[in-house]
């Protein structure tokens, strides 16, 4: 009996001694009946004492196995927690190093982390499905093996009690489910660890990219410095141009510089060292304002190009803002170039004054507006009228009030000429009614003795009852000038 109880079936279960005793199975039923009902699940009748004894050690073995698996899972959890703690420390160090980074890099890291998580999720689902499928296949194979073994034993021997096999199968399936859940739990920290490793790698890649990008910053700083130098040079040139007066020698020199390229080959020096030096010792104070718009457009960046060589300033994409600023500043300089047309005019005026030996004299030079010129002319006209009145004050038939009706009889012309040439004719013999005789005598005597041109026609004066005031005024002015040249009229020297 003890050897029979110690025997194990193919699937690891103990075989009860009732299998050899056909009388014990089924409450004393014959062996043929037990063989006929071997494949059916028989729940009739209470279990025997040997069946109970077999159940107890089976349950004890299952509980021991479960406890061992639980201990193993606890150890796995502890190890996974340690690994997670080490990875968290690594993450903390990486976060400290990345604390000085910009928010844009953090955003990119989050995006990369999300992408990696989304990529890892379908992989995890596939792994879980594959593990579940393999577990199901193993369970089906295990279930098939005990069933086939039980059938073979039933053919040769009596079948063991069905309750024990059913409970054992239930316990196996439960343990398999628990192991599957624990495997899933164990895969979760592994997945987290892989996600954390992926994040750490992405952060390292970002750090390397930033470390590569950092050496480019000095280039941008150097370019900014060169741009500031160019702006300072432009401001100094503008201040020098404002300090120079319109008629100063430096301006004339600038004009000479403008004329030389226009008359010559038209070549503009590319650097300040090639510009001609001024005799006053100002050196390179020539500004771009003295040049034309085309010269400014072509040569405004030449000083900066000569200051910094291509080897000092490496070309990089950030150079575009500096070129944009230069393009924006160019219109301002172009606008200021044509705003200085006074230089040539002042020079031409000086040349005219030097050529004629002094400033222009006369009323036209004193008065520039029409009202002042008219007032001056009226003043001169009145002065000349007063002079004629004073010269003919003692003569009869003469009353000079204007340059028109007072000169209609011709007696005023004869009296004025007789004043300076009393021996030319006898004024007492003249008749105011003889107008033609009077005009002819006055104009001919003035032409002979005073060299005064005969600007008035005798026929015109006789035909007009009231002579034209402008014609009379012009003739009297010419007579006065002729008398001054003869020395007969004294003028006040200023």
Swiss-Prot record:
What processes in GO biological process is this protein linked to?
Answer: muscle organ morphogenesis; negative regulation of DNA-templated transcription; positive regulation of vasoconstriction; response to activity; response to xenobiotic stimulus; vasoconstriction
Q: Which Pfam families match?
A: CH
Q: What segment(s) does the record annotate as region Disordered? A: 1-348
Show the ranges annotated as biased composition (Basic and acidic residues). 1-10, 74-104, 112-166, 179-232, 324-335
SUPFAM superfamilies assigned: Calponin-homology domain, CH-domain
One GO term in the molecular function aspect is:
calmodulin binding
Where found, per UniProt? Answer: Cytoplasm, Myofibril; Cytoplasm, Myofibril, Sarcomere, I band; Cytoplasm, Myofibril, Sarcomere, M line; Nucleus
Please indicate if the UniProt record lists Hydrolase as a keyword.
no
Keyword Nucleus listed? The answer is yes
Q: Which residues carry this modification: Phosphoserine?
A: 336
Q: How is it modified after translation?
A: Maximal phosphorylation of Ser-336 correlates with maximal relaxation of aorta in response to acetylcholine.
Q: Name one GO cellular component term.
A: cytoplasm
- Transmembrane portions of the chain: none
Q: Where is the Calponin-homology (CH) domain?
A: 378-484
Q: Where is the composition biased (Acidic residues)?
A: 233-255
Q: Which parts of the sequence are annotated with region: Calmodulin-binding?
A: 476-494
For this protein, the record's InterPro entries field holds: CH_dom, CH_dom_sf, F-actin_Monoox_Mical
Q: Which UniProt keywords apply?
A: Calmodulin-binding, Coiled coil, Cytoplasm, Muscle protein, Nucleus, Phosphoprotein
Q: Where is the composition biased (Low complexity)?
A: 269-279, 302-314
What does this chain do? Plays a role in the regulation of contractile properties of both striated and smooth muscles. When unphosphorylated, may inhibit myosin dephosphorylation.
What's the name of the protein? Smoothelin-like protein 1
Origin organism of this chain?
Homo sapiens (Human)
Q: Which gene encodes it?
A: SMTNL1
């Amino acid at each position: 009996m003890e050897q029979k109880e110690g025997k194990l079936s193919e699937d690891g279960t103990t075989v009860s001694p009732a299998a050899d005793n056909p009388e014990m199975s089924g409450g004393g039923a014959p062996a043929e009946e037990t063989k006929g009902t071997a494949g059916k699940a028989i729940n009739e009748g209470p279990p025997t004492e040997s069946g109970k004894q077999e159940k107890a050690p089976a349950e004890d073995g299952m509980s021991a196995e479960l406890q061992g698996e639980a201990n193993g899972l606890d150890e796995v959890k502890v190890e996974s927690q340690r690994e997670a703690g080490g990875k968290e420390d690594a993450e903390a160090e990486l976060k400290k190093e990345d604390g000085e980074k910009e928010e844009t890099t953090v955003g990119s890291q989050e995006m990369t982390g999300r992408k990696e998580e989304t990529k890892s999720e379908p992989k995890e689902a596939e792994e879980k499905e594959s593990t579940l499928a393999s577990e199901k296949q193993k369970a089906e194979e295990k279930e098939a093996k005990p069933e086939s073994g039980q059938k073979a034993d039933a053919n040769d021997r009596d079948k063991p009690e069905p309750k024990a096999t059913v409970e054992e199968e239930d316990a196996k399936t439960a343990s398999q489910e628990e192991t599957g859940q624990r495997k899933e739990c164990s895969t979760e920290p592994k997945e987290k660890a892989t996600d954390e490793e992926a994040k750490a790698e992405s952060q390292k890649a970002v750090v390397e990219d930033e470390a590569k990008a950092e050496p480019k910053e000095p280039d941008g700083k150097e370019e900014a410095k060169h741009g500031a130098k160019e702006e300072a040079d432009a401001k100094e040139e503008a201040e020098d141009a404002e300090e120079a007066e319109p008629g100063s020698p430096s301006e004339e020199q600038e004009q000479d510089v403008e004329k030389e390229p226009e008359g010559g080959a038209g070549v503009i020096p590319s650097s300040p060292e090639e510009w001609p030096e001024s005799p006053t010792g100002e050196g390179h104070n020539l500004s771009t304002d003295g040049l034309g718009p085309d010269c400014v457009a072509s040569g405004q960046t030449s000083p900066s190009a000569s200051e910094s060589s291509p080897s000092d300033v490496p070309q990089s994409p950030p150079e575009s803002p500096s070129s944009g600023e230069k393009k924006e500043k160019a219109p301002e300089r172009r606008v200021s170039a044509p705003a200085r047309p006074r230089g040539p005019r002042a020079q031409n005026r000086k040349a005219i004054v030097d050529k004629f030996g002094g400033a222009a004299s006369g009323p036209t030079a004193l008065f520039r507006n029409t009202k002042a010129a008219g007032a001056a002319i009226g003043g001169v006209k009145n002065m000349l009228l007063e002079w004629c009145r004073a010269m003919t004050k003692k003569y009869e038939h003469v009353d000079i009030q204007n340059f028109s009706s007072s000169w209609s009889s011709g007696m005023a012309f004869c009296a004025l000429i007789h004043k300076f040439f009393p021996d030319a004719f006898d004024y007492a013999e003249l008749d105011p009614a003889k107008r033609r005789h009077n005009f002819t005598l006055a104009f001919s005597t003035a032409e002979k003795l005073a060299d005064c041109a005969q600007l008035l026609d005798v026929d015109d004066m006789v035909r007009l009852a009231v002579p034209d005031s402008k014609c009379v005024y012009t003739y009297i002015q010419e007579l006065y000038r002729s008398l001054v040249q003869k020395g007969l009229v004294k003028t006040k020297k200023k």
